[in-house]
Amino acid sequence: MEVEEGRARVKVEGVFYNPRMRFCRDLDMLVFATMDSKEYFDALSASGIRGIRAALEAGKKAVFNDVSPKAVKVIEENLRENGVSGEVINGDAAAVMRQRAFEHIDIDPFGSPAPFMDSACFSAKRYLSVTATDTAALCGSATNSGLKKYGAFAVKTDVYHEVGLRMLIGFVVREATKYEKALFPLISWVREHYYRVHFKIKKSTAMSAKVYEKMGYLAYCSTCLRKKVLGMGEGAERCECGGKFSLIGPIWLGELKQRDFAEKVAEKAEGKLRAFLEKILAEIDAPTAYSLPALAKIHSLTLPPTDVVVEELKKLGYEASRTHYCGFCVKTDADRDVVVKILRSRKII
């Protein structure tokens, strides 16, 4: 079986290939083309589709790896068919990354990236790209799995994808600090069943300590959906409504993108990719977000248009935006009581 994707045509019979991730790979090519790196290491290559596309569409010198001898044969055949030259390694990804350094490493596993992160952070020199499809462990649906894999506690909130993405970023950033590396998200997103983050790496003892200023906790009340941002070492009392706070974290509280980089990526995009990137660019970086249907349900209110709530928050002097992952969610630095007050005041069409 052969598939065409981007400028590549590859055989996928007998190896893992997920057609649902084509949108992600399309977007990745724009990201890779914006990065100023030359080398790209596809640690878990399978068919080799992403690495081959990186070579053809982003001009990268791709290095491929897979633990399966069958996958290695498929990759080699696909390289020949596409006229691409590249080193192909048959090895355990974590072991390979311990043996040599790579300019840009991509960890795109089936499931959790956690088993590969220590080695990836040790090896990556300038860029690190990470995918997670075990969203239940990250967003609070599987609390124990989140603790074991990512070393952070989460409960499922009304905006669980916001929590999940920040929990993933926080985990990767913490792993890298062990090697005096500071990681910052260039661009990140949530879509369907996965989270995707592209990091810039800075090798610096001082900066690797400073990233913890962007790390902390989210105090969440399941009774009224209130959220409070807490820095490392801070605590939370009972919620104003009388409910008990759950302390989610540690998670990343900083920016989910670097605007100048994301804008350059968007300039290369068309159609659905451009529309998706514009949503990401329009989104503010506040770690607090609210599901308007969930708030409206608690207070038995009719739901206003999301854009109306965003504009009302801005009129009051708060930062506010829609989210790229939920059509009825609002990100804002305003307290939840302010959002509820707006919901109460609107006469809905």
From Swiss-Prot:
Asked whether the keyword Cytoplasm is assigned, the reply is no
Q: What's one Pfam family the UniProt record gives for this protein? A: TRM
UniProt-listed Enzyme Commission number(s): 2.1.1.216
Q: Which residues form the Trm1 methyltransferase domain?
A: 1-343
What is catalysed by this protein?
guanosine(26) in tRNA + 2 S-adenosyl-L-methionine = N(2)-dimethylguanosine(26) in tRNA + 2 S-adenosyl-L-homocysteine + 2 H(+)
Binding sites annotated in the UniProt record for S-adenosyl-L-methionine: R25, R50, D66, D92, A93
Q: Does the keyword Chaperone apply?
A: no
Give one GO term, molecular function aspect: tRNA binding
Q: Which UniProt keywords apply?
A: Methyltransferase, RNA-binding, S-adenosyl-L-methionine, Transferase, tRNA processing, tRNA-binding
Q: Which InterPro entries match?
A: SAM-dependent_MTases_sf, Trm1, TRM1_arc_bac, tRNA_met_Trm1_C
* BP GO terms, sorted: tRNA N2-guanine methylation
Q: Which family does it belong to?
A: Belongs to the class I-like SAM-binding methyltransferase superfamily. Trm1 family.
Entry function? Dimethylates a single guanine residue at position 26 of a number of tRNAs using S-adenosyl-L-methionine as donor of the methyl groups.
Q: What is this protein identified as?
A: tRNA (guanine(26)-N(2))-dimethyltransferase
- In its UniProt entry, the species of origin is given as Archaeoglobus fulgidus (strain ATCC 49558 / DSM 4304 / JCM 9628 / NBRC 100126 / VC-16)
